[in-house]
Amino acid sequence: YKPAERNSLKAQQYLPTSFSIAYDALAFIVNKNNVDTLLSVKDVQDIMNGKVTKWSQLDKRNNKGTITVVFDNPKSSTVHFIEDSVLGGKPIINKNVAAVKKTAEVIKYVEQNPDAIGIIGNNWLNDKRDTTNLTFKRNISVMSLSKIHPATPQSSRKPYQYYIYNGEYPFIRTIYALLNDPRQGLPWGFAHFIQGPKGQRIVMK
């Protein structure tokens, strides 16, 4: 928890126990016509803090112009993750940032704007029940991310389940459940279930 979150919980006399139930990751998507499909963590930091504003600064072959960063919502968990975990608690200061209302609109924006880079949850890469999902989008590319700078094909990973599990993909988020049940009753039983094999298969789906 952040200090402000802890203070808020204490003020409400709500002191939950937290435990992890799943892992998620941020996926970076670009227009299919964009030749740049590799980014390092440093590249992402430089884009967010305004040091890198043009695609040609990342790849001289890239003539797509100014980089436009697109989020699903200005107050979303994606924005918070970038600011807290990628920028070390500092705000995003890139002036070319666009925020839409939902993930499907991020995908549509990237489809229509070759200069854009969209940031979404990787669950949108795998949910085949949703026809707005990236599985069905042939004019979108999912970028590979590298912890090492500069990024190379050998050092970069896409947000696939295996690379999230072994920690090779850089932008991983832990999903926590919070319990405030001193009697350790039904909520704790559910917690143990969701952490078990059957519960984890449900989470995976």
What spans do the regions from the language model cover?
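Exported/periplasmic ABC-transporter solute-binding proteins
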Residues: 2-3, 7-24, 29-205
